[in-house]
Design a protein with these regions (language model features):
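Short beta-strand element of the alpha/beta-hydrolase
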Residues: 48-58
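Short alpha-helix in the alpha/beta-hydrolase fold that links the catalytic acid
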Residues: 249, 263-273
C-alpha cells in the first residue's frame, strides 16, 4: 500500500556535517527566560577573531531563523565560520513553550534579550558585532546607537518608523488585489489615521472604520484585532531613523530591491541621510526579496517555492566586509 510521503523540499545551502569549524552550546538569561544558542567557532579562533551576535526578525523563531525549511542563520553562520568569523545565534524567548502569547512582548523586550548575550561574547572576543535580519536589523541599529556594538550588519532592517512600515505593508497587500489606486490610497489613509489613534492610547474597540469600502472592511477589522496587542502598539512607535546619527561604529546595511515587507528605497534613503557619524556601506541587492532570495515578484508566497536560502553574493558581501574592518 502507498502511504502519503512527507513533501521533500530542496534546500541545497543548508550546512551538512562534517564542518571545518567547532560548535558550542551556549545559554544566557534575561527577564526570567533562558536562551539556548549555538556558538560557531572557526578553526584557530582566538580573542582577536571577530564575533557576530545574530538577531532574528519578527515573530517567534529558532536560532536558525527557520522558515519553510530554510535556515538562513545556519547558512550565514556557516559562511562566516569558513571565512574566520565566529557567531552566536539563539532561540527566541519562550521558544517551544506553546503557552506563550508572543504578541505580549515588544521589540524592546527582544532588544534587551539580544543585549543580554553581549557580555558573554565580550569575555571571549575583542571585536563584537551584531547582525540582524528585518526587526533584528532594527535592533542592531538601536544597540549600536547605545554604543553596544563594534560593528553591525543590517539585513533588510527597518530604518523608517514602525507606523510607516505597517502602512507600506498594507499598501503592498491591498495593491496586489488589483484594486484602483484611489481605493488603495483611501484604505492606506484610514490605516495611517487608525495607527495614530492607537499610538495615542485609543482602544481598537473605540475606533470607527466608516470611510472604508465595504469589500475592504473585513481586512481592516483583522488588522485592527492584531493592532490591539502590546507588540503592535509598541511597534507603531519605533523610529530607528531618529537614532542613526548616534551610531559611531561601522555599519553594513543591505536591502533587497524586491523586498515587499521592508521597502528598499524608503529605508535606504533614511540610512543614507541618517548615518552621518560612522563609516557605512549601504547596498541595494538587485532582484532579491525580504529573505535575500533571488525571486520573481518578492511576494511572501514565493519564499517556500524558492530553493535558494540566501543569495551567495549577500554571504560574500557580509564576510568580506567584516574581514576588511
Amino acid at each position: 500500500t502507498l502511504k502519503p510521503g512527507k513533501l521533500v523540499v530542496k534546500r541545497p545551502q543548508t550546512p551538512v556535517a562534517p564542518f571545518p569549524y567547532k560548535e558550542e552550546n551556549i545559554s544566557f538569561t534575561n527577564a526570567g527566560y533562558t536562551f539556548n544558542g549555538t556558538l560557531t567557532l572557526p578553526q584557530n579562533y582566538s580573542k582577536t577573531t571577530p564575533v557576530v551576535l545574530m538577531v532574528t526578525g519578527s515573530g517567534q523563531q529558532n536560532r536558525d531563523e527557520e522558515l519553510f525549511d530554510h535556515k538562513p542563520f545556519a547558512v550565514i553562520a556557516d559562511a562566516l565560520a569558513r571565512q574566520g568569523i565566529a557567531s552566536l545565534r539563539y532561540d527566541d524567548r519562550g521558544w517551544n513553550d506553546k503557552n506563550i502569547d508572543f504578541y505580549q512582548f515588544t521589540t524592546n523586550d527582544f532588544l534587551q534579550d539580544a543585549a543580554s548575550a553581549l557580555p558573554l561574547l565580550r569575555k571571549r572576543f575583542n571585536k563584537v558585532g551584531i547582525l540582524g535580519h528585518s526587526e533584528g536589523g532594527t535592533i542592531a541599529m538601536m544597540l549600536a546607537a547605545e554604543g553596544k556594538a563594534d560593528f553591525i550588519v543590517s539585513l533588510a532592517g527597518m530604518a523608517i518608523s514602525g507606523k510607516e512600515t505597517l502602512v507600506m505593508q498594507n499598501r503592498q497587500a491591498i495593491s496586489s488585489l488589483g484594486l484602483p489606486k484611489e481605493m488603495v490610497d483611501s484604505y492606506c489613509n484610514n490605516i495611517s489615521n487608525i495607527l495614530d489613534e492607537i499610538a495615542n492610547g485609543k482602544k481598537t474597540s473605540e475606533i470607527t472604520i466608516d470611510g472604508v469600502p465595504d469589500n475592504l472592511k473585513p481586512i481592516l477589522k483583522r488588522s485592527l484585532e492584531q493592532a490591539n496587542s502590546p507588540y503592535i502598539r509598541h511597534f507603531i512607535t519605533i523610529d530607528a531613523g531618529k537614532q542613526l546619527s548616534k551610531i559611531k561604529c561601522p555599519v553594513l546595511a543591505l536591502n533587497g530591491t524586491k523586498d515587499t515587507q521592508v521597502d528598499c528605497a524608503a529605508n535606504t534613503t533614511i540610512l543614507e541621510t541618517g548615518l552621518s557619524n560612522c563609516k557605512h556601506t549601504i547596498k541595494k541587492i538587485d532582484g532579491v526579496n525580504h529573505l535575500f532570495q533571488h525571486c520573481s515578484t518578492g511576494s511572501v508566497v514565493e519564499y517556500q517555492q524558492i530553493e535558494e536560502t540566501i543569495a551567495p553574493e549577500v554571504l560574500e558581501t557580509i564576510t568580506k566586509w567584516i574581514n576588511e574592518l
